[in-house]
């Protein structure tokens, strides 16, 4: 059996139609007895864990931009600073699509620092 590199597989997937990809996904799930569940569903199931989950201190936080406020340009600049590798257009789109997660799975210190910077720029931010 030929061994394909990840790049070769991606190129093959690019040539497939959406219907073909869906059929492939279903066959993959059946063959390996797995499901392609969205990560959000896993996080929601974990949050529904009850009191045991509440007793544990969270070590990963999501920084959610609830509202950009009146000083949108300043918030866009801070978003570019907080989220590495983000261009001006991407940062603007992110700010305008609030409420939106800016950082996901950040450490407590990083999340608090990002929240402080964004709030100083005039944004309404929450940690989840």
UniProtKB/Swiss-Prot annotation:
UniProt keyword annotations, A-Z: Ribonucleoprotein, Ribosomal protein
Record-linked Gene3D superfamilies: 3.30.1390.10, Single helix bin
GO molecular function, one term: mRNA binding
One cellular component (GO) term of this entry: cytosolic large ribosomal subunit
CDD domains named in the record: Ribosomal_L7_L12 (cd00387)
GO biological process: translation
Claim: Ribonucleoprotein is one of the keywords in the record: yes
Self-association state and partner proteins as the record states: Homodimer. Part of the ribosomal stalk of the 50S ribosomal subunit. Forms a multimeric L10(L12)X complex, where L10 forms an elongated spine to which 2 to 4 L12 dimers bind in a sequential fashion. Binds GTP-bound translation factors.
Family: Belongs to the bacterial ribosomal protein bL12 family.
Function: Forms part of the ribosomal stalk which helps the ribosome interact with GTP-bound translation factors. Is thus essential for accurate translation.
Protein name (record): Large ribosomal subunit protein bL12
Phylogenetic classification of the source organism: Bacteria, Bacillati, Actinomycetota, Actinomycetes, Mycobacteriales
């Amino acid at each position: 059996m030929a061994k394909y590199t990840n790049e070769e597989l991606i190129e093959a997937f690019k040539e497939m139609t959406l219907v073909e990809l869906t059929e492939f996904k279903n066959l993959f799930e059946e063959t390996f007895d797995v499901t392609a569940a969205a990560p959000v569903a896993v996080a929601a199931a974990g949050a529904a864990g009850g009191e045991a989950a509440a007793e544990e201190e969270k070590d990963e936080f999501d920084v959610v931009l609830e509202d950009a406020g009146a000083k949108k340009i300043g918030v866009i600049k801070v978003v570019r600073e907080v989220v590495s590798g983000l261009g001006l257009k991407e940062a603007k789109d992110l700010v305008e699509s609030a409420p939106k997660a800016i950082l996901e799975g950040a450490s407590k210190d990083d999340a608090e620092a990002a929240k402080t910077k964004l709030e100083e720029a005039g944004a309404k931010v929450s940690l989840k």
